[in-house]
Amino acid sequence: MTQLTVSKKTPKPLVSISIPVLNEAANIPALYARLTGIAARMQDRCAMEFVFSDNHSDDQTWSLLTDLAKRDDRVRAIRFSKNCGFQRSILANYLHTRGDAVMQIDADLQDPPEMVEAFFDRWKQGYQVIYGIRRKRPEGIFINAFRKLGYWVIDKLSESPIPRDVGDFRMIDRKVIDVLAATRSSNPYLRGMIAGLGFNQTGIPYDRDARVAGESKFNITRLVRLGLTAVFNHSTVPLRMASLLGIVILFISVLGAAYYVFVRLFYPDLPRGFVSTQILILFGIGLNSFLLGIIGEYLLRIFVMLRSEPIAIIEQSLNFSDQELKL
Protein backbone atom coordinates (compact mmCIF):
# COMPACT_ATOMS: atom_id res chain seq x y z
CA MET A 1 0.00 0.00 0.00
CA THR A 2 1.33 3.43 -0.94
CA GLN A 3 1.68 5.62 2.14
CA LEU A 4 1.14 9.38 2.24
CA THR A 5 2.49 11.39 5.13
CA VAL A 6 1.32 14.97 5.55
CA SER A 7 3.54 17.01 7.83
CA LYS A 8 4.24 20.70 8.29
CA LYS A 9 7.94 19.79 8.30
CA THR A 10 7.73 18.28 4.83
CA PRO A 11 9.56 20.65 2.45
CA LYS A 12 7.59 19.47 -0.55
CA PRO A 13 4.12 21.01 -1.04
CA LEU A 14 1.06 18.77 -1.12
CA VAL A 15 -1.10 18.92 -4.25
CA SER A 16 -4.66 17.61 -3.93
CA ILE A 17 -6.28 16.29 -7.09
CA SER A 18 -10.02 16.90 -6.65
CA ILE A 19 -12.21 14.62 -8.79
CA PRO A 20 -16.03 14.69 -8.71
CA VAL A 21 -17.56 11.52 -10.15
CA LEU A 22 -21.02 10.32 -11.16
CA ASN A 23 -21.30 6.90 -12.82
CA GLU A 24 -17.71 7.01 -14.05
CA ALA A 25 -16.75 3.36 -13.42
CA ALA A 26 -15.57 2.99 -17.02
CA ASN A 27 -13.11 5.88 -16.66
CA ILE A 28 -11.68 5.42 -13.17
CA PRO A 29 -9.01 2.77 -13.99
CA ALA A 30 -7.52 4.86 -16.81
CA LEU A 31 -7.75 8.03 -14.72
CA TYR A 32 -6.00 6.43 -11.76
CA ALA A 33 -3.24 5.04 -13.98
CA ARG A 34 -2.54 8.46 -15.45
CA LEU A 35 -2.65 10.19 -12.06
CA THR A 36 -0.18 7.76 -10.50
CA GLY A 37 2.12 8.25 -13.47
CA ILE A 38 2.00 12.01 -12.96
CA ALA A 39 2.64 11.62 -9.23
CA ALA A 40 5.69 9.47 -9.97
CA ARG A 41 7.12 12.08 -12.36
CA MET A 42 6.52 14.91 -9.88
CA GLN A 43 7.55 13.08 -6.69
CA ASP A 44 10.70 15.18 -6.31
CA ARG A 45 8.67 18.40 -6.53
CA CYS A 46 5.50 17.65 -4.56
CA ALA A 47 3.43 15.03 -2.77
CA MET A 48 -0.05 14.20 -4.05
CA GLU A 49 -3.40 12.96 -2.83
CA PHE A 50 -6.40 11.97 -4.97
CA VAL A 51 -9.71 13.08 -3.46
CA PHE A 52 -12.91 11.79 -5.07
CA SER A 53 -16.49 12.88 -4.39
CA ASP A 54 -19.08 10.35 -5.55
CA ASN A 55 -22.36 12.10 -6.37
CA HIS A 56 -24.39 8.99 -5.44
CA SER A 57 -23.43 6.87 -8.46
CA ASP A 58 -25.55 3.81 -9.23
CA ASP A 59 -22.84 1.86 -11.09
CA GLN A 60 -19.58 0.34 -9.79
CA THR A 61 -17.90 3.69 -9.16
CA TRP A 62 -17.90 3.43 -5.36
CA SER A 63 -16.72 -0.19 -5.42
CA LEU A 64 -13.77 0.75 -7.60
CA LEU A 65 -12.88 3.66 -5.33
CA THR A 66 -13.09 1.35 -2.31
CA ASP A 67 -10.62 -1.06 -3.90
CA LEU A 68 -8.24 1.75 -4.81
CA ALA A 69 -8.42 3.26 -1.31
CA LYS A 70 -7.48 -0.10 0.23
CA ARG A 71 -4.37 -0.31 -1.95
CA ASP A 72 -3.34 3.34 -1.97
CA ASP A 73 -3.61 5.72 1.00
CA ARG A 74 -3.36 8.65 -1.37
CA VAL A 75 -6.87 7.81 -2.59
CA ARG A 76 -9.54 9.40 -0.39
CA ALA A 77 -13.23 9.55 -1.20
CA ILE A 78 -16.58 10.75 0.07
CA ARG A 79 -19.97 9.55 -1.14
CA PHE A 80 -23.05 11.77 -0.89
CA SER A 81 -26.46 10.58 0.29
CA LYS A 82 -27.99 11.85 -2.97
CA ASN A 83 -27.04 13.60 -6.18
CA CYS A 84 -26.43 17.14 -4.92
CA GLY A 85 -25.47 18.64 -8.29
CA PHE A 86 -22.14 19.10 -10.01
CA GLN A 87 -21.14 22.49 -8.59
CA ARG A 88 -22.00 21.54 -5.03
CA SER A 89 -20.08 18.27 -5.37
CA ILE A 90 -17.00 20.23 -6.44
CA LEU A 91 -17.30 22.64 -3.51
CA ALA A 92 -17.86 19.80 -1.03
CA ASN A 93 -14.78 18.03 -2.37
CA TYR A 94 -12.69 21.19 -2.10
CA LEU A 95 -13.56 21.35 1.60
CA HIS A 96 -12.13 17.84 2.10
CA THR A 97 -8.76 18.42 0.46
CA ARG A 98 -5.58 19.02 2.45
CA GLY A 99 -3.26 20.31 -0.24
CA ASP A 100 -1.34 23.56 -0.42
CA ALA A 101 -2.73 23.65 -3.96
CA VAL A 102 -5.85 21.90 -5.27
CA MET A 103 -6.28 20.74 -8.87
CA GLN A 104 -9.80 20.12 -10.18
CA ILE A 105 -10.05 17.35 -12.81
CA ASP A 106 -13.10 15.67 -14.34
CA ALA A 107 -13.06 11.87 -14.42
CA ASP A 108 -13.96 11.68 -18.12
CA LEU A 109 -10.36 12.62 -19.07
CA GLN A 110 -11.47 15.31 -21.51
CA ASP A 111 -9.19 17.68 -19.62
CA PRO A 112 -5.69 16.12 -19.77
CA PRO A 113 -4.44 15.39 -16.21
CA GLU A 114 -0.85 15.75 -17.42
CA MET A 115 -1.38 19.52 -17.44
CA VAL A 116 -1.07 19.41 -13.65
CA GLU A 117 2.66 19.94 -14.19
CA ALA A 118 2.12 23.18 -16.12
CA PHE A 119 -0.45 24.38 -13.59
CA PHE A 120 1.94 23.55 -10.74
CA ASP A 121 4.71 25.60 -12.38
CA ARG A 122 2.40 28.63 -12.53
CA TRP A 123 1.39 28.09 -8.91
CA LYS A 124 5.07 28.05 -7.89
CA GLN A 125 5.44 31.37 -9.72
CA GLY A 126 2.94 32.92 -7.30
CA TYR A 127 -0.43 32.55 -9.02
CA GLN A 128 -3.29 31.57 -6.70
CA VAL A 129 -5.77 30.68 -9.47
CA ILE A 130 -4.71 28.95 -12.70
CA TYR A 131 -7.49 27.92 -15.09
CA GLY A 132 -7.50 26.08 -18.40
CA ILE A 133 -8.74 28.00 -21.45
CA ARG A 134 -10.36 25.72 -24.01
CA ARG A 135 -9.07 26.39 -27.52
CA LYS A 136 -11.22 23.67 -29.05
CA ARG A 137 -13.53 20.96 -27.82
CA PRO A 138 -14.82 17.77 -29.51
CA GLU A 139 -18.49 18.74 -29.61
CA GLY A 140 -21.00 19.54 -32.31
CA ILE A 141 -21.27 22.97 -33.91
CA PHE A 142 -24.60 23.67 -32.21
CA ILE A 143 -23.37 22.86 -28.69
CA ASN A 144 -20.16 24.85 -29.21
CA ALA A 145 -22.10 27.87 -30.46
CA PHE A 146 -24.56 27.55 -27.57
CA ARG A 147 -21.72 27.45 -25.04
CA LYS A 148 -19.94 30.44 -26.58
CA LEU A 149 -23.18 32.43 -26.51
CA GLY A 150 -23.65 31.47 -22.87
CA TYR A 151 -20.09 32.50 -21.95
CA TRP A 152 -20.62 35.84 -23.71
CA VAL A 153 -23.93 36.57 -21.95
CA ILE A 154 -22.58 35.59 -18.53
CA ASP A 155 -19.45 37.71 -19.02
CA LYS A 156 -21.46 40.74 -20.13
CA LEU A 157 -23.98 40.54 -17.29
CA SER A 158 -21.63 39.56 -14.47
CA GLU A 159 -20.41 42.31 -12.17
CA SER A 160 -17.01 40.61 -11.95
CA PRO A 161 -15.29 39.57 -15.20
CA ILE A 162 -15.58 35.81 -15.74
CA PRO A 163 -13.02 34.30 -18.17
CA ARG A 164 -14.58 32.94 -21.35
CA ASP A 165 -14.13 29.37 -22.59
CA VAL A 166 -13.17 28.34 -19.07
CA GLY A 167 -14.70 25.44 -17.16
CA ASP A 168 -13.81 23.92 -13.80
CA PHE A 169 -10.39 22.65 -14.91
CA ARG A 170 -8.25 24.74 -12.56
CA MET A 171 -5.68 24.80 -9.79
CA ILE A 172 -6.32 27.03 -6.79
CA ASP A 173 -4.28 27.92 -3.74
CA ARG A 174 -5.23 26.90 -0.20
CA LYS A 175 -6.06 30.55 0.54
CA VAL A 176 -8.81 30.41 -2.10
CA ILE A 177 -10.17 27.17 -0.60
CA ASP A 178 -10.33 28.82 2.82
CA VAL A 179 -12.35 31.73 1.44
CA LEU A 180 -14.74 29.35 -0.37
CA ALA A 181 -15.15 27.39 2.86
CA ALA A 182 -16.17 30.58 4.66
CA THR A 183 -18.89 31.40 2.12
CA ARG A 184 -20.61 27.99 2.28
CA SER A 185 -22.98 28.84 -0.60
CA SER A 186 -25.69 26.18 -1.01
CA ASN A 187 -26.18 27.08 -4.69
CA PRO A 188 -22.69 27.90 -5.94
CA TYR A 189 -21.43 28.85 -9.37
CA LEU A 190 -17.74 28.31 -8.73
CA ARG A 191 -16.39 29.89 -11.91
CA GLY A 192 -18.04 33.16 -10.95
CA MET A 193 -17.24 32.86 -7.26
CA ILE A 194 -13.54 32.22 -7.85
CA ALA A 195 -13.27 34.88 -10.55
CA GLY A 196 -14.84 37.41 -8.17
CA LEU A 197 -12.49 36.66 -5.28
CA GLY A 198 -9.55 38.39 -6.89
CA PHE A 199 -6.11 36.94 -6.08
CA ASN A 200 -3.43 36.52 -8.74
CA GLN A 201 -5.07 34.66 -11.64
CA THR A 202 -3.88 33.40 -15.01
CA GLY A 203 -4.97 30.99 -17.74
CA ILE A 204 -3.31 28.26 -19.80
CA PRO A 205 -4.76 27.44 -23.28
CA TYR A 206 -5.29 23.77 -24.12
CA ASP A 207 -7.22 21.50 -26.47
CA ARG A 208 -9.96 19.41 -24.90
CA ASP A 209 -9.99 15.70 -25.72
CA ALA A 210 -12.96 13.46 -26.45
CA ARG A 211 -14.53 11.59 -23.55
CA VAL A 212 -12.73 8.26 -23.02
CA ALA A 213 -15.84 6.29 -22.00
CA GLY A 214 -19.35 6.76 -20.70
CA GLU A 215 -21.78 9.56 -21.45
CA SER A 216 -21.75 13.24 -20.61
CA LYS A 217 -24.00 14.22 -17.71
CA PHE A 218 -24.62 17.66 -19.22
CA ASN A 219 -27.44 18.35 -21.66
CA ILE A 220 -28.97 21.59 -22.93
CA THR A 221 -31.38 21.80 -19.98
CA ARG A 222 -28.60 21.51 -17.41
CA LEU A 223 -26.43 23.98 -19.29
CA VAL A 224 -29.28 26.51 -19.30
CA ARG A 225 -29.87 25.92 -15.58
CA LEU A 226 -26.17 26.43 -14.87
CA GLY A 227 -26.18 29.60 -16.97
CA LEU A 228 -29.16 31.00 -15.05
CA THR A 229 -27.40 30.25 -11.78
CA ALA A 230 -24.34 32.10 -13.08
CA VAL A 231 -26.37 35.16 -14.07
CA PHE A 232 -28.61 35.43 -11.02
CA ASN A 233 -25.82 34.60 -8.54
CA HIS A 234 -23.34 37.13 -9.89
CA SER A 235 -25.33 39.94 -11.46
CA THR A 236 -27.94 42.49 -10.45
CA VAL A 237 -28.27 43.62 -14.07
CA PRO A 238 -31.54 41.69 -14.75
CA LEU A 239 -33.17 43.25 -11.69
CA ARG A 240 -32.04 46.74 -12.69
CA MET A 241 -33.11 46.13 -16.28
CA ALA A 242 -36.55 45.15 -14.98
CA SER A 243 -36.79 48.44 -13.08
CA LEU A 244 -35.55 50.43 -16.07
CA LEU A 245 -37.96 48.66 -18.41
CA GLY A 246 -40.81 49.46 -16.04
CA ILE A 247 -39.88 53.15 -16.11
CA VAL A 248 -39.67 53.13 -19.92
CA ILE A 249 -43.08 51.45 -20.24
CA LEU A 250 -44.56 53.95 -17.76
CA PHE A 251 -43.14 56.84 -19.79
CA ILE A 252 -44.53 55.41 -23.04
CA SER A 253 -47.90 54.88 -21.37
CA VAL A 254 -48.03 58.51 -20.23
CA LEU A 255 -47.18 59.69 -23.75
CA GLY A 256 -49.81 57.34 -25.18
CA ALA A 257 -52.44 58.64 -22.76
CA ALA A 258 -51.60 62.25 -23.63
CA TYR A 259 -51.77 61.46 -27.33
CA TYR A 260 -55.14 59.73 -26.88
CA VAL A 261 -56.58 62.76 -25.03
CA PHE A 262 -55.26 65.07 -27.74
CA VAL A 263 -56.80 62.98 -30.54
CA ARG A 264 -60.18 62.68 -28.80
CA LEU A 265 -60.31 66.44 -28.23
CA PHE A 266 -59.63 67.41 -31.83
CA TYR A 267 -61.05 64.35 -33.63
CA PRO A 268 -64.02 63.18 -31.57
CA ASP A 269 -65.54 61.18 -34.44
CA LEU A 270 -62.61 58.74 -34.83
CA PRO A 271 -63.59 55.11 -34.02
CA ARG A 272 -62.35 53.80 -30.71
CA GLY A 273 -59.61 51.16 -30.87
CA PHE A 274 -61.00 48.08 -29.11
CA VAL A 275 -58.41 45.74 -30.65
CA SER A 276 -55.48 48.01 -29.79
CA THR A 277 -56.74 48.24 -26.22
CA GLN A 278 -56.81 44.45 -25.88
CA ILE A 279 -53.32 44.15 -27.35
CA LEU A 280 -51.99 46.70 -24.87
CA ILE A 281 -53.63 44.84 -21.99
CA LEU A 282 -52.12 41.53 -23.09
CA PHE A 283 -48.74 43.21 -23.54
CA GLY A 284 -48.93 44.64 -20.04
CA ILE A 285 -49.86 41.27 -18.53
CA GLY A 286 -47.01 39.53 -20.35
CA LEU A 287 -44.50 42.20 -19.34
CA ASN A 288 -45.57 42.03 -15.70
CA SER A 289 -45.25 38.25 -15.71
CA PHE A 290 -41.75 38.49 -17.18
CA LEU A 291 -40.61 41.09 -14.63
CA LEU A 292 -42.13 39.14 -11.75
CA GLY A 293 -40.25 36.08 -12.99
CA ILE A 294 -36.94 37.95 -12.74
CA ILE A 295 -37.77 39.14 -9.24
CA GLY A 296 -38.85 35.60 -8.35
CA GLU A 297 -35.46 34.19 -9.37
CA TYR A 298 -33.73 36.47 -6.88
CA LEU A 299 -36.29 35.72 -4.17
CA LEU A 300 -35.81 32.00 -4.76
CA ARG A 301 -32.07 32.33 -4.18
CA ILE A 302 -32.65 34.33 -1.00
CA PHE A 303 -35.04 31.61 0.18
CA VAL A 304 -32.51 28.86 -0.54
CA MET A 305 -29.81 30.79 1.31
CA LEU A 306 -32.02 31.42 4.36
CA ARG A 307 -33.13 27.78 4.41
CA SER A 308 -29.48 26.89 5.18
CA GLU A 309 -29.57 23.65 3.22
CA PRO A 310 -26.26 21.78 3.58
CA ILE A 311 -23.97 21.73 0.57
CA ALA A 312 -24.06 17.94 0.67
CA ILE A 313 -24.61 15.08 3.11
CA ILE A 314 -21.84 12.50 3.35
CA GLU A 315 -23.11 8.94 3.43
CA GLN A 316 -19.77 7.09 3.34
CA SER A 317 -16.08 7.94 3.26
CA LEU A 318 -12.76 6.26 2.48
CA ASN A 319 -9.45 7.07 4.24
CA PHE A 320 -11.05 9.91 6.21
CA SER A 321 -11.24 10.09 9.98
CA ASP A 322 -14.48 11.34 11.53
CA GLN A 323 -12.70 14.54 12.56
CA GLU A 324 -11.72 15.25 8.95
CA LEU A 325 -15.29 15.16 7.60
CA LYS A 326 -16.56 18.72 7.20
CA LEU A 327 -20.20 18.04 6.22
What are these regions (language model features)?
Residues 40-45, 69-74:
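Short helix-capping segments at alpha-helix termini
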Residues 1-37, 45, 324:
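N-proximal low-complexity "stem/linker" segments adjacent to membrane-targeting elements
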Residues 2-13, 189-327:
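Hydrophobic helical membrane-anchoring modules
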Residues 102:
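Short aromatic/hydrophobic "clamp" motif used to bind/position activated sugar donors
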Residues 43-56, 78-79:
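Short beta-strand/loop segment that forms part of the nucleotide-sugar
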Residues 78-96, 110-193, 209-228:
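Acceptor/aglycone-binding surface of glycosyltransferases and processive sugar-polymer synthases
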Residues 54-63, 109-110:
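A conserved acidic beta->alpha catalytic loop
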Residues 24-27, 57, 112:
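Donor nucleotide-sugar binding loop of glycosyltransferases
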